[in-house]
Design a protein with these regions (language model features):
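Catalytic and GAP-homology cores of small GTPase regulators
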Residues: 1-132, 139, 148, 159-227
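A short glycine/serine-rich beta->alpha loop
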Residues: 137-143
Length: 227
């Protein structure tokens, strides 16, 4: 009847309005991170009544909005502020890594944003990834630190094998030695580390091509800085 048609029309137009607002927010965010987030607050998409609410809404925006600038997402997630760190937590928690190989999980995670260039930002991002992966696969690792150091080791391997600025690469024996030195423990198959090595050797993790990220990944080779 007429009332149903009116309700349908209003619903469709409300959806169109929301879509337009999100498109506008994406454009503003891509131009300037702060302005984009302020706009999202102005249209009621971000509830900033508490830190947790605000962080959850920003994480949802990052995960569910198409055509966002990946460099800006990575830059925000890497910042050393309460809001960025809490957003990174909920951003990582939005992934489901249960029963997924850790290399595949890293591929999924790193496709959604551009790794920032600063080492400390990179550390925080890998830490939150590994924490989520550990929580989703608690029987695989003996502790959360093992998940973190293995994740870091994989990124080192990626850099050593596929960054043209690294001349000598890394052998399986060298990779395994790094992991043993970091006392990585878990319920692993005998060929677990060699399988990871071969995956990265044959099919590198796809990373956005930005010189700043390349330089940051090169710094990972200085493992002693992490310890």
């Amino acid at each position: 009847d007429y009332a149903d048609k009116v309700n349908l029309y209003m619903k469709e137009n409300t959806n169109l309005k929301k879509k337009y607002e999100l498109q506008t927010a994406a454009t503003k965010f891509n131009e300037n991170i702060k302005n984009g987030l302020l706009y999202l607050k102005s249209i009621g998409y971000i509830n900033d009544s508490t830190l947790v609410n605000e962080a959850k809404d920003i994480a949802s925006f990052f995960r569910n909005t198409p055509n966002l600038k990946k460099q800006n997402i990575g830059e925000f997630l890497g910042e050393n502020t309460d809001l960025s760190i809490t957003t990174l937590k909920y951003f990582a928690e939005s992934f489901d890594f249960k029963n997924i190989d850790i290399v595949q999980a890293l591929r999924m995670f790193l496709l959604t944003f551009l790794l920032p260039g600063e080492g400390q930002k990179l550390d925080r991002i890998i830490e939150h990834f590994s924490s989520k992966y550990y929580n989703d696969n608690p029987t695989l690792f003996a502790n959360a630190d093992s998940a973190f150091y293995l994740s870091y080791g994989i990124m080192i391997l990626q850099t050593a094998l596929h960054n043209p600025n690294v001349k000598d690469g890394m052998s399986l024996e060298e990779f395994s030695k790094i992991l043993v030195e970091q006392n990585i423990q878990g319920n692993f198959k005998d060929d677990y580390f060699s399988d990871i090595y071969n995956q990265i050797l044959e099919d590198p993790i796809s990373l956005p091509e930005l010189e700043e990220s390349k330089q940051s990944l090169l710094k990972l080779l200085r493992w002693e800085d992490l310890c």
